[in-house]
Amino acid sequence: FEDLKNCYSENEEYASAIDHLSLNQKSFYDTNYDPLHENRVDEPVSPNPYENSEESNFTLEDSSDSSAVVLTSAHGEVLKKRRLSLNQTMSNEDLEAIANDSEEEIIEPWSVPYSFQSNLKFKYQRSIKKGAVITDAMHQSLIRESNGQHLKAMHVVDRKHEVKFDIDGYVSTATRIRPVTLKISKTQLYVCAQEEGQPVLLKE
């Protein structure tokens, strides 16, 4: 009993000493203080559109061979889409991870002037990827239109409708630019650029 009393007395003295510390001093173990994450006035802060769960919700799309979890905004806009196998289960933590997952880097198109194209010759270097599936920032996949000459992007659940591409790389001794070609797998149809706003054209 005397030992316990002495320990209690020592704890009281320690607590009293702590109370006299300056409020401006931050403990090494104070998890609420992190100078590395302070917002500066001169640095813009990018809002995360997925942080407020009240503005978005999840839905489940089912098909005969696969399922997909779709995150939509309050206005019905599809923000993200993730495919699931039929036997895969989702927890609240999994849904939160999907919502907070940072977006993949969006590749911006760059058009080469026709005069530049005609002055250079490129030769085949290597195959970069076989059977690649290409999606946009909204996780829409490319499918072929009914006429077979154009591609369009849309959300699909049945993966057999997705177009798969072979990506090949080319080089030239006159420039460091290394262009690539997109060809539909198991065909001789190549993706050809058209004017802005026009559908993607396929040519042999």
Swiss-Prot record:
Prodomain positions: 1-110
Sugar-modified residues: N57, N87, N100
Function: Produced by activated macrophages, IL-1 stimulates thymocyte proliferation by inducing IL-2 release, B-cell maturation and proliferation, and fibroblast growth factor activity. IL-1 proteins are involved in the inflammatory response, being identified as endogenous pyrogens, and are reported to stimulate the release of prostaglandin and collagenase from synovial cells.
Annotated gene: IL1A
Annotated family: Belongs to the IL-1 family.
Native organism taxonomy: Eukaryota, Metazoa, Chordata, Craniata, Vertebrata
Biased composition (Polar residues): 49-64
InterPro entries reported for this sequence: IL-1_alpha (IPR003295), IL-1_fam (IPR000975), IL-1_propep (IPR003502), IL1/FGF (IPR008996)
GO terms under cellular component: cytosol; extracellular space
Swiss-Prot/TrEMBL GO biological process terms: cellular response to heat; cellular response to lipopolysaccharide; cytokine-mediated signaling pathway; fever generation; immune response; positive regulation of cell division; positive regulation of cytokine production; positive regulation of immature T cell proliferation in thymus
Protein name, per record: Interleukin-1 alpha
A Pfam family hit: IL1
Domain comment, as recorded: The similarity among the IL-1 precursors suggests that the amino ends of these proteins serve some as yet undefined function.
SUPFAM superfamilies according to UniProt: Cytokine
Positions of region (Disordered): 34-64
Location of this chain's protein in the cell: Cytoplasm; Secreted
Subunit structure and binding partners: Monomer. Interacts with TMED10; the interaction mediates the translocation from the cytoplasm into the ERGIC (endoplasmic reticulum-Golgi intermediate compartment) and thereby secretion.
Residues recorded with modification Phosphoserine: S85
